[in-house]
């Protein structure tokens, strides 16, 4: 409407670049679709067949569940989803939710809650034995913003997407992390990576455009290559989604502190649809 270029940094909604995508909007973070596919790839290796899901009842949670189901069923046609819980965001009744999931006798759980809801879910689930002898796959839970506040109560062995901020040993991340610690005297979080890479992307786009004209900036952002602390990324011309990835691993508690272990970096571009398919999902101009 306003015809102003917009680089969305934190939002995860698939609609932003697909069903409601437009010429002016670009997105940095790996989307719900991308991260759900990353987790489904690991979930498919589990023996679990009976799955339940728990997610906040709004677009993010709904699309996270829908994408995970579709991706896992494609890899493992034998699995079945036997129950769903949809707590209101920020208002989870954790005891009720946990009991409802227990009644379904699942082999595994897919969790999309985060923040205060996650802490309540973890506490009640642990008290009531929900996680005993069950696999849990959990979106975003390895991000330090959500994992560190759990402290020694953090669950162990969950398969998560996240950011093992103190374990990555690459030149590009070392350079960023050292500068960040020197500037702020604290460890970087996912938000730190996102904020830094957003600013680098905008600067690169302005430099390439050579002006602040909206059309020139859009043209510059389409196909733009940027160096991030996770390595080089590209903003795809087809849908304006960047190829920034995420780390996938398991949760653990080491010396009383939660952390990610057994992790690997999942390149964002490997978990996106083809360019033609993405373009077809966008509204016609």
What is each PLM-predicted segment?
Residues 124-196, 207-212, 260-284:
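Extracellular/periplasmic periplasmic-binding protein-like sensory domains
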Residues 10-18, 22-127, 164-175:
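Extracellular/periplasmic Venus flytrap/periplasmic-binding protein
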Residues 213-230:
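Short, well-structured alpha-helical segments that form the helix of a local strand-helix-strand
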Residues 35, 64, 117, 194-198, ...:
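Catalytic-loop motifs flanking and including active-site residues across diverse enzymes
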Residues 5-14, 135-141:
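Short beta-strand elements of ligand-binding domains
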Residues 53-56, 187-193, 214-217, 233-234:
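Surface-exposed patches in mature extracellular/periplasmic domains of secreted proteins
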């Amino acid at each position: 409407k306003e015809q102003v270029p917009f680089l969305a940094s934190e939002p995860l909604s698939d609609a932003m670049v697909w069903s409601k995508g437009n010429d002016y909007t670009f997105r940095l973070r790996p989307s719900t679709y991308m991260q759900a596919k990353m987790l489904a790839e690991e979930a498919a290796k589990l023996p679990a067949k009976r799955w339940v899901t728990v997610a906040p009842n709004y677009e993010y949670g709904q699309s996270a569940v829908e994408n995970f189901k579709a991706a896992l069923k494609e890899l493992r046609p034998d699995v079945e989803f036997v129950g769903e819980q949809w707590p209101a965001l920020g208002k989870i009744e954790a005891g009720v939710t946990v009991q409802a999931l227990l009644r379904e006798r699942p082999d595994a759980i897919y969790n999309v809650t985060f923040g205060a809801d996650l802490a309540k879910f973890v506490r009640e689930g642990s008290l009531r034995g929900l996680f005993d002898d069950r696999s849990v796959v959990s979106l975003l839970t390895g991000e330090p913003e959500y994992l560190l506040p759990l402290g020694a109560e953090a669950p162990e062995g969950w398969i998560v997407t996240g950011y093992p901020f103190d374990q990555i040993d690459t030149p590009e991340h070392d350079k960023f992390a050292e500068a960040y610690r020197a500037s702020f005297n604290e460890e970087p979080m996912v938000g730190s990576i996102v904020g830094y890479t957003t600013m680098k992307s905008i600067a690169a786009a302005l430099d390439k455009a050579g002006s602040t004209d909206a059309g020139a900036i859009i043209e510059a952002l389409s196909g733009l290559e940027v160096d991030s602390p996770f390595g080089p990324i590209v903003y795809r011309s087809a849908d304006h989604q960047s190829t920034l990835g995420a780390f996938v691993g398991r949760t653990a508690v080491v010396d009383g502190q939660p952390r990610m272990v057994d992790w690997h970096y999942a390149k964002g571009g490997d978990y996106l649809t083809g360019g033609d398919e993405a373009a077809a999902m966008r509204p016609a101009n």
